[in-house]
Curated annotation (Swiss-Prot):
It comes from Paraburkholderia xenovorans (strain LB400). Transmembrane segments: none annotated. This is Formate-dependent phosphoribosylglycinamide formyltransferase. The keyword Nucleotide-binding applies. Involved in the de novo purine biosynthesis. Catalyzes the transfer of formate to 5-phospho-ribosyl-glycinamide (GAR), producing 5-phospho-ribosyl-N-formylglycinamide (FGAR). Formate is provided by PurU via hydrolysis of 10-formyl-tetrahydrofolate. Residues 123-318 form the ATP-grasp domain. It comes from the Bacteria. Residues 384-404 are annotated as: Disordered. It catalyses: N(1)-(5-phospho-beta-D-ribosyl)glycinamide + formate + ATP = N(2)-formyl-N(1)-(5-phospho-beta-D-ribosyl)glycinamide + ADP + phosphate + H(+). Pfam families: ATP-grasp, PurT_C, RS_preATP-grasp-like.
C-alpha cells in the first residue's frame, strides 16, 4: 500500500485494509473515521458485540494475548495496517508480524512494546530521555514493594505495570495500606505479571493530556509533529470523569509540555496520534504516561476541534494531512452504567440533548457495570467553564435503567 497516495474501495481487491486490535468506544470512533475515508476495517476484541464490532466491516473475537491466535488472524485477514487500541496484546508477535512484512504496526511494533506496560515507557522517559517524572521504583513482591516505598516515601501510588483505566491502582498513606494495595494490584493487572510500579506523589495543580500527532507534512513529505490545544481533566480512582479543552496554562508550561511530548513521541516513532499525560504546577511540568493511540480524555475533541482525535489518528496513519485547530471551547462528562446488567436502556436522552450545544455518545456496550463507562456527554460554550457546566448537566440527565 502506498501510504498517502491512494485508498482503495472497501470489500474489493483494491481495498485499503486496517485491523484494529481493541474495539471499545475509542476504537469505534477510529473505525468510523477510517470508514469515512473509504477504508475497509476489521475490528478485533476479546468479547462479542464490542462497540467497534457494531460498525466494522468484519468482526472477530480472540484472545489478543495469544500469539498463535493473533498471527493466524493477521494471516487470514491480511491487513495493510494494524492499529492497537488496547495494551493487552501479544506485542512480541506484533514485532514478528511487522518484521516479516505481513503488516505495518501503528505507530511501530517497538512503540507498542514499550507502552504496553508502565515500566518500559517510564524507563524510556526518565532514564533514556531524561524527562522530569515522579520518583518511582518497581517491585515483584511485597517485600520489594515495601523497599520501593521506603525509597519514594508516603503518600505514594501503586499501580500494576500493565493495566488500564485505573484498574488495580491504590493511594497509600501509611504502612497499613501496603499489603491491601499489593493484593489489589495483583487483581487489577490486565496481564498478571506480578509486578508493580510505586510512584511518589507530585504536588501538582492540574493534569493535562497533550494530544500529539506525528503525521506526514505535505510540504516536505516527511513526518512532522503537531499539537492539539491542551486538555484538562479530572480523574477519580484513576478513571477520567470529565475533560475540557483548552486548559489554561502559562506560556512556559505549555512550551515545556510540548517539549516533553515531542521528545517522547519522537523516541517512539511512527505515525499516529499519541496521548501524553503530564502533571503541571506553575511553569513546571512532569511526564506521567503516554498512549500511542487516542486517549479517553480526548473524547472532548469530538465537539471542540475541527477534526477529532480519532479523525486525526485516521489521517495520520494513512499518511494524510492533519489540522489540529480548535473550533470552540468544549467539555466531556462520563455517563456510567449505574447497574450491573446486560442490555440496559437509557432514559433522559431528550432532556440531555435539550441542553444548549450538547451532544451524546452512547457506546453500545453489551453489558453494563455500576462504574463502567457507557457513554459521554459533550458540549461547547463561550468558555470552558460554560462547556463543562453544560456537559455535566447533559450527562446527569441520562438515566441508565433496567430493560427487564
Amino acid at each position: 500500500m502506498q501510504i498517502g497516495q491512494r485508498i482503495g474501495t472497501p470489500l474489493s481487491e483494491s481495498a485499503t485494509r486496517v485491523m484494529l486490535l481493541g474495539a471499545g468506544e475509542l476504537g469505534k470512533e477510529v473505525i468510523i473515521a477510517l470508514q469515512r475515508l473509504g477504508v475497509e476495517v476489521i475490528a478485533v476484541d476479546r468479547y462479542p458485540n464490542a462497540p467497534g464490532h457494531q460498525v466494522a466491516h468484519r468482526a472477530h473475537v480472540i484472545d489478543m494475548t495469544d500469539r498463535a491466535a493473533l498471527r493466524a488472524l493477521v494471516e487470514q485477514e491480511r491487513p495493510h495496517l494494524i492499529v492497537p487500541e488496547i495494551e493487552a496484546i501479544a506485542t512480541d508477535e506484533l514485532a514478528a508480524i511487522e518484521s516479516a512484512g505481513l503488516a505495518e504496526v501503528i505507530p511501530t511494533a517497538r512503540a507498542t512494546q514499550l507502552t504496553m506496560n508502565r515500566e518500559g515507557i517510564r524507563r524510556l522517559a526518565a532514564e533514556e530521555l531524561g524527562l522530569p517524572t515522579s520518583p518511582y521504583a518497581f517491585a515483584d513482591s511485597l517485600d520489594e514493594l515495601r523497599a520501593g516505598i521506603a525509597k519514594v516515601g508516603y503518600p505514594c501510588v501503586v499501580k500494576p505495570v500493565m493495566s488500564s483505566s485505573g484498574k488495580g491502582q491504590s493511594v497509600l498513606r501509611g504502612d497499613a495500606d501496603v499489603e491491601p494495595a499489593w493484593q489489589y494490584a495483583m487483581a487489577g493487572g490486565r496481564v498478571n505479571h506480578g509486578r508493580v510500579i510505586v510512584e511518589g506523589f507530585i504536588d501538582f495543580e492540574y493534569e493535562i493530556t497533550q494530544l500529539t500527532v506525528r503525521a506526514i507534512n505535505p510540504a516536505s513529505g516527511e513526518v512532522s509533529t503537531y499539537f492539539c490545544d491542551p486538555i484538562g481533566h479530572v480523574q477519580v480512582a484513576g478513571d477520567y470523569v470529565e475533560s475540557w479543552q483548552p486548559q489554561p496554562m502559562s506560556p512556559l508550561a505549555l512550551e515545556r509540555s510540548r517539549e516533553v511530548a515531542h521528545k517522547v513521541t519522537a523516541a517512539l516513532g511512527g505515525r499516529g496520534l499519541f496521548g501524553v499525560e503530564l502533571f503541571v504546577r506553575g511553569d513546571d511540568v512532569w511526564f506521567s504516561e503516554v498512549s500511542p493511540r487516542p486517549h479517553d480524555t480526548g473524547l472532548v475533541t469530538l465537539c471542540s476541534q475541527r477534526f477529532s482525535e480519532f479523525e486525526l489518528h485516521a489521517r495520520a496513519i494513512l499518511g494524510l494531512p492533519v489540522d489540529t485547530s480548535l473550533r470552540a471551547p468544549g467539555a466531556s462528562a462520563v455517563i456510567y452504567g449505574g447497574l450491573d446488567e446486560a442490555g440496559i436502556a437509557f432514559e433522559g436522552v431528550a432532556a440531555a440533548l435539550a441542553v444548549p450545544n450538547a451532544d451524546l455518545r452512547l457506546f453500545g456496550k453489551p453489558e453494563s457495570f455500576v462504574k463502567r463507562r457507557m457513554g459521554v456527554a459533550l458540549a461547547t460554550g463561550e468558555t470552558t467553564d460554560e462547556a463543562r457546566s453544560r456537559a455535566k448537566q447533559a450527562a446527569a440527565a441520562v438515566r441508565p435503567v433496567s430493560a427487564k
